[in-house]
Swiss-Prot record:
The keyword Secreted applies. HAMAP family: Enolase. Mg(2+) binds at residues 244, 291, 318. This is Enolase. Catalyzes the reversible conversion of 2-phosphoglycerate (2-PG) into phosphoenolpyruvate (PEP). It is essential for the degradation of carbohydrates via glycolysis. GO terms for cellular component: cell surface; extracellular region; phosphopyruvate hydratase complex. Keywords: Cytoplasm, Glycolysis, Lyase, Magnesium, Metal-binding, Secreted. Disulfide bonds: none annotated. Pathway: Carbohydrate degradation; glycolysis; pyruvate from D-glyceraldehyde 3-phosphate: step 4/5. The active site is at 207 (proton donor), 343 (proton acceptor).
Length: 434
């Protein structure tokens, strides 16, 4: 039977050694689902609230016992006593949103609500004897995503003196996900050898990318291009580049202040100058995607950027849209960006996550399913990417098990789909004039 009989949460650790929420759901027939909730370092101010204890005597204030208690003492009784079916995802998500009663899930915590939401879906898939991607996407979920591999970390994700947070490679010329993953791994290892030859650090950041002390953005880009070529691939044909600028991290009082991360050598740019700079970079290098090129509240700057280069480059809104349909609809109406980053914990339920993906795709925007910098062994986002035919996934570099777990899950899914599996490569960027 599909009736949920038990919902239980506990405090566990994420990839940074910080507490996070794990939730387990059990049905009367024995179907079981478990979910672990991720956490971000650079967060948009409009994201749903991640509830932390604030008790400095435990985990430096980052404990999540309040969120755990909210699951065990508030959400669980509502679900169990309400005799909810594990198959009724939308009703359960709606009930939790109403139980919270705030616009940003600040009462119960998005980390509490999301843990339950995903665990319910996993238990439902278990009940039906289906893999999660098939339960979520039906027979139509069959497109494997192009991986955005973050092989150099900067900004808030490392101690490297570079303002941009992520430098990514996208193996769009591969014929399968399996091949794209191999290309990425080969480039990653070639990059490591190049860094070693230069006497640069090969320690990795939060998302598994290297965090060396490059001389600046262009030094990082040119070194990555050398690694692509050394691995035997053609930049701008086989493999493209991408940035996550995370501009909100260095934007203040109308100025994009690169000195925050780059010191005295960093520039200070107005919105117009920031647009000019990004346009200059895409003219010089094979860049296909730029995330958060402007501050989340600089909508005028975003409009300038979109009008200027939105037909040539994917412009992804992360802090801008925060997986929120209300904000995304305004962006679509005003012609802001052409893509949305999808982070399940930015909004807090699977139902709202799928609503955001559907809205984006109907408007001709792409949807990039994404991890967070604080991750776990949970692989749900891999299944979401395939279930929704998102076509793109951003889940870190080619190191750290918390990142590799998602790639390995996608390999399993591709094998299971066999001849029905699709990998669209460059066609996944349907928002661009190619």
């Amino acid at each position: 039977m599909p009736i949920i009989t038990d919902v239980y949460a506990r405090e566990v650790l994420d990839s940074r050694g910080n507490p996070t929420v794990e939730v387990e759901v059990l049905t009367e027939s024995g179907a079981f689902g478990r979910a672990l909730v991720p956490s971000g370092a650079s967060t948009g101010e409009h994201e749903a609230v991640e509830l932390r204890d604030g008790d400095k005597s435990r985990y430096l204030g980052k404990g999540v016992t309040k969120a755990v208690e909210n699951v065990n003492e508030m959400i669980a009784p509502e679900i169990v006593e309400g005799e909810f079916s594990v198959l009724d995802q939308v009703s359960i998500d709606k009930m939790m949103i109403q139980l919270d009663g705030t616009h940003n899930k600040g009462k119960l915590g998005a980390n509490a609500i999301l843990g339950v939401s995903i665990a319910v879906a996993r238990a439902a898939a278990d009940l039906l004897g289906q893999p999660l991607y098939k339960y979520l996407g039906g027979f139509n979920g069959k497109q494997l995503p192009v991986p955005m591999m973050n092989i150099v970390n900067g900004g808030s994700h490392s101690d490297a003196p570079i303002a941009f947070q992520e430098f990514m490679i996208l193996p769009v010329g591969a014929e399968s996900f399996k091949e794209s993953l191999r290309w990425g791994a080969e480039i990653f290892h070639n990059l490591k050898s190049i860094l070693s030859e230069r006497g640069l650090e090969t320690a990795v950041g939060d998302e598994g990318g290297f965090a060396p002390r490059f001389e600046g953005t262009e030094d990082a880009v040119e070194t990555i291009i050398k690694a692509i070529e050394k691995a035997g691939y053609k930049p701008g044909e086989d493999v493209f580049l991408g940035f996550d600028c995370a501009s909100s991290e260095f934007y203040e009082n109308g100025v994009y202040d690169y000195t925050k991360f780059e010191g005295e050598h960093g520039a200070k740019r107005s919105a117009a100058e920031q647009v000019d700079y990004l346009e200059e970079l895409i003219g010089k290098y094979p860049i296909i995607t730029i995330e958060d090129g402007m501050d989340e509240n600089d909508w005028e700057g975003w409009k300038q950027l979109t009008d200027r280069i939105g037909d040539k480059v994917q412009l992804v809104g992360d802090d801008l849209f925060v997986t929120n349909t209300e904000i995304l609809s305004k962006g679509i109406e005003q012609g802001i960006g052409n893509s949305i980053l999808i982070k399940v914990n930015q909004i807090g339920t699977l139902t709202e996550t799928f609503d955001a993906i559907e809205m984006a795709q109907k408007a001709g925007y792409t949807a990039v399913v994404s991890h967070r910098s604080g991750e776990t062994e949970d692989t749900t986002i891999a299944d979401i990417a395939v279930a929704t035919n998102a076509g793109q996934i951003k889940t870190g570099s080619l190191s750290r098990t918390d990142r590799i777990a998602k790639y390995n899950q996608l390999l399993r899914i591709e094998d299971e789909l066999y001849e029905t599996a699709k990998f669209e490569g460059i066609k996944s960027f349907y928002n661009l004039d190619k």
